[in-house]
Amino acid sequence: MTEAKKSLKRTLVGKVVSDKRAKTVTVLIERRVKHELYGKIVGKSSKYHAHDETGEYKLGDIIEITESRPISKTKNWVATRLVQKAAVV
């Protein structure tokens, strides 16, 4: 087989909302889902703590996170790549 194996780990893209903790960033994932009963499109959001070994991701950056083994009590995700740098105001 010449094709690469597909990873079973989930990947999500979201915005860094906190970078105050050492080696950890908090990422806000926003998604739009259809309400089961009424059919209206509603916004849902979740916050995940992701491991950032080098501390390269800053507040406002759009990053990709990948599911991993538990690193601590609340960290099960690792920041893998920078999608978009935060805009300087």
Swiss-Prot record:
Coiled-coil zones: none
Keywords associated with the record: Ribonucleoprotein, Ribosomal protein, RNA-binding, rRNA-binding
GO BP terms, alphabetized: translation
NCBIfam families: PRK05610.1 (NF004123), uS17_bact (TIGR03635)
UniProt subunit comment: Part of the 30S ribosomal subunit.
InterPro entries: NA-bd_OB-fold (IPR012340), Ribosomal_uS17 (IPR000266), Ribosomal_uS17_bact/chlr (IPR019984), Ribosomal_uS17_CS (IPR019979)
Pfam families: Ribosomal_S17
Lineage: Bacteria, Pseudomonadati, Pseudomonadota, Betaproteobacteria, Burkholderiales
Task of the protein: One of the primary rRNA binding proteins, it binds specifically to the 5'-end of 16S ribosomal RNA.
Descriptive protein name: Small ribosomal subunit protein uS17
Species assigned in the record: Albidiferax ferrireducens (strain ATCC BAA-621 / DSM 15236 / T118) (Rhodoferax ferrireducens)
Record GO cellular component, one term: cytosolic small ribosomal subunit
MF (Gene Ontology): rRNA binding; structural constituent of ribosome
Family per similarity comment: Belongs to the universal ribosomal protein uS17 family.
